[in-house]
Amino acid sequence: MTRYIFVTGGVVSSLGKGIASASLAAILEARGLKVTMLKLDPYINVDPGTMSPFQHGEVFVTHDGAETDLDLGHYERFIRTRMTQNNNFTTGRVYEDVLRRERRGDYLGATIQVIPHITDEIKRRIIKGAGDADVALVEVGGTVGDIESQPFLEAIRQLRVEVGAKRAMLMHLTLVPYIATAGETKTKPTQHSVKELRSIGLQPDVLVCRSDRAIDVSSRRKIALFTNVEERAVISLPDADTIYKIPGILHAQGLDDYVVERFGLECRGADLSEWDRVVDAKLHPEKEVNIAMVGKYMELLDAYKSLIEAMSHAGIQSRTKVNLRYIDSEDIENQGTGLLEGVDAILVPGGFGLRGVEGKIATVRYARENKIPYLGICLGMQVAVIEFARDVLGWSDANSTEFDKDSGHPVVGLITEWADASGNTEVRTEASDLGGTMRLGAQECGLEPGSKVFECYGKERIVERHRHRYEVNNNLLPQLQAAGLKITGRSGDGALVEVVEAPDHPWFVACQFHPEFTSTPRDGHPLFSGFVNAALEYKAKKA
């Protein structure tokens, strides 16, 4: 029977509930338990797919094609369990399903209310998402006291009662600030946060106290006294120089032992040797490279969370310190490609819309002409094709129909038909809704033997995740290939271009898929490892 650990946050947001939850999950997994994780988002959007990256950050795409919260990326990077569409849902999704049933008449004329109809749907989704896991960690977005979170917290209260105390526990993250002028940490915000929780019928079993430093024993004892939590369950979680230290920090304080004892689970001790290796490689690199990342959402780096982590993972695998130089593509437009001087490689990630695209195209040209290692992802591949068409073929009006519907040479256009992650045929037009209408999820791709991308993966068939609605125009491919553009990866059915490479270049690879979604700190990802190795080779030749 599944045990549930519900995770809430108090005092302020951005305490790191996702990292703390994933770290505990990693320890429990290291003890041989089957673990899964869920994220409940209180906002009213159906999913984050159409939300601004500046507001929400990255949209993480699961293997089965769900557009989800970026915390699911943390979950997959910390545990081996693959997330699905059942591991993340929002208030909007819950209300959408309940209202659809009401319209069908499923409720037989009953008055639809938050309690019991909305809370019942939340509980149903939690149980479904947990599946047959030994332990399911369920993170609630936002902070206690937010009006949006109330239905979720009420559903948790009910579910704890229904499954019993031996199958459910509540872990609450809270802020314990250090006041420099007083020279001490303050526990009062934590006390008030727990008081708020208890007022809605929830007593925390574990308190994870976030601070910029370790919390002393006397403060932990005081927190335990005033919050009715066992002293051993008051955990100090200070800032760390890498998030991959967190499993070790929690384990050292016995959090996993407390959870296992509380649930009455029989399992082995935790083997965190893999995480020790990751931390050692991260903190003790032997080499160093500087890579320019040219994007259009640089004001909020969370928009590229998985990509930044994937570059870190590639560094871990080769014991290389990867210094990312974040450059806004609009700055390239305004100040020129001189901003790229001195880097060992260039990375252009995905994005949507016209803003900053010309800066990305100029970046591609700089990388191609100066023989600097280049990796383009999604839009980064599309601008690579546009640049090649303009500067090699001489099609000055070459563009994507996303940016110029009247282009004389639309080398990138809207995909109108494709197979989804389940093999079903999807059809889209310009009139389709924006939400949920892209080519999403895991798709098979065939690689060309002898190509740079094949050298990275070492096999002809791969599976990678996608999130796009525009693709290279097959009608203009013959001219592009005749001019030297290499098509080194195609979709499983051969219909869509997946990878392109530039001729006469030491390492120029651009892919339509998003390899960052499957990179992990323990295993890395072959494409990013190949990219970092190319940067190291380029740097060595410069020396």
Curated annotation (Swiss-Prot):
Chain segments carrying region Amidoligase domain: 1-265
Pathway terms, separated by semicolons: Pyrimidine metabolism; CTP biosynthesis via de novo pathway; CTP from UDP: step 2/2
Binding site for L-glutamine: 351, 379-382, 402, 469
Residues that coordinate or bind CTP: 13, 146-148, 186-191, 222
Sequence positions that bind ATP: 14-19, 71
Keywords: ATP-binding, Glutamine amidotransferase, Ligase, Magnesium, Metal-binding, Nucleotide-binding, Pyrimidine biosynthesis
Active site: 378, 514, 516
Residue positions binding UTP: 13, 186-191, 222
Class of the enzyme per the UniProt entry, highest EC level: ligase
GO BP terms: 'de novo' CTP biosynthetic process; pyrimidine nucleobase biosynthetic process
Documented EC number(s): 6.3.4.2
InterPro entries: Class_I_gatase-like, CTP_synthase, CTP_synthase_N, GATASE, GATase1_CTP_Synthase, P-loop_NTPase
List of residues binding Mg(2+): 71, 139
Entry GO CC: cytosol
Reaction(s) catalysed by this chain's protein: UTP + L-glutamine + ATP + H2O = CTP + L-glutamate + ADP + phosphate + 2 H(+); L-glutamine + H2O = L-glutamate + NH4(+); UTP + NH4(+) + ATP = CTP + ADP + phosphate + 2 H(+)
Record comment: activity regulation: Allosterically activated by GTP, when glutamine is the substrate; GTP has no effect on the reaction when ammonia is the substrate. The allosteric effector GTP functions by stabilizing the protein conformation that binds the tetrahedral intermediate(s) formed during glutamine hydrolysis. Inhibited by the product CTP, via allosteric rather than competitive inhibition.
GO molecular function list: ATP binding; CTP synthase activity; glutaminase activity; identical protein binding; metal ion binding
Similarity annotation: Belongs to the CTP synthase family.
Note: CTPSs have evolved a hybrid strategy for distinguishing between UTP and CTP. The overlapping regions of the product feedback inhibitory and substrate sites recognize a common feature in both compounds, the triphosphate moiety. To differentiate isosteric substrate and product pyrimidine rings, an additional pocket far from the expected kinase/ligase catalytic site, specifically recognizes the cytosine and ribose portions of the product inhibitor.
Subunit structure: Homotetramer.
Function: Catalyzes the ATP-dependent amination of UTP to CTP with either L-glutamine or ammonia as the source of nitrogen. Regulates intracellular CTP levels through interactions with the four ribonucleotide triphosphates.
Name by which UniProt lists this protein: CTP synthase
Gene responsible for this protein: pyrG
